[in-house]
Amino acid sequence: MAKPTVNINQAIRAREVRVVGADSEQLGIMSLQEALALAEARQLDLVEVSPTAVPPVCRIMDYGKFKYQQSKKLQEARKKQSHVQVKEVKLRPKTDEHDLMTKIKHVRRFIEEGNKAKVTLVFRGREITHLEFGSRALDRVAAELEDIAVVEFKPKMEGRSMFMIVAPKVKK
């Protein structure tokens, strides 16, 4: 991903620019030379903030400080992002009651942590002829978790396995 380039000082190619001061005060439209002289008198940089405007908008500011603040904002935004993982729990069509409840507890824990959960039911051998056992088991899991989770992907066959994805309910 290419970083957007910002023109500063002599890199600005417009003849006339709209100048905004360091404190966001409008200084008006002036020639590039006048704007550069004004920025130099204040010992600051002339930074082109809106090159597509007519005339382009330039701000008088300390460019080094501006870059530092932009990088800090970017770091804060990255820090606030939450990474949702998809955890997987595998079942079999003949999984007994207690084992199924244990697997449901695992899925419940994943959902409470804010992650999505993929519940996979693996068919082996001739079990594939009884798909209704698999869909019943996945429906049971969905029913047990309906208080804290919503089914994002309905049960679906993929090869010799049937899966569904459950996600945490969105809090209002």
UniProtKB/Swiss-Prot annotation:
Pfam families in the record: IF3_C (PF00707), IF3_N (PF05198)
SUPFAM superfamilies: Translation initiation factor IF3, C-terminal domain (SSF55200), Translation initiation factor IF3, N-terminal domain (SSF54364)
Function in brief: IF-3 binds to the 30S ribosomal subunit and shifts the equilibrium between 70S ribosomes and their 50S and 30S subunits in favor of the free subunits, thus enhancing the availability of 30S subunits on which protein synthesis initiation begins.
Localization per record: Cytoplasm
Glycoprotein as UniProt keyword: no
Cytoplasm as UniProt keyword: yes
Keywords from the named record: Cytoplasm, Initiation factor, Protein biosynthesis
Oligomer and partners: Monomer.
Organism annotation: Geobacter sulfurreducens (strain ATCC 51573 / DSM 12127 / PCA)
Superkingdom of source: Bacteria
Protein name, as recorded: Translation initiation factor IF-3
InterPro entries, sorted: T_IF-3_C_sf, T_IF-3_N_sf, Translation_initiation_fac3_CS, Translation_initiation_fac_3, Translation_initiation_fac_3_C, Translation_initiation_fac_3_N
Family: Belongs to the IF-3 family.
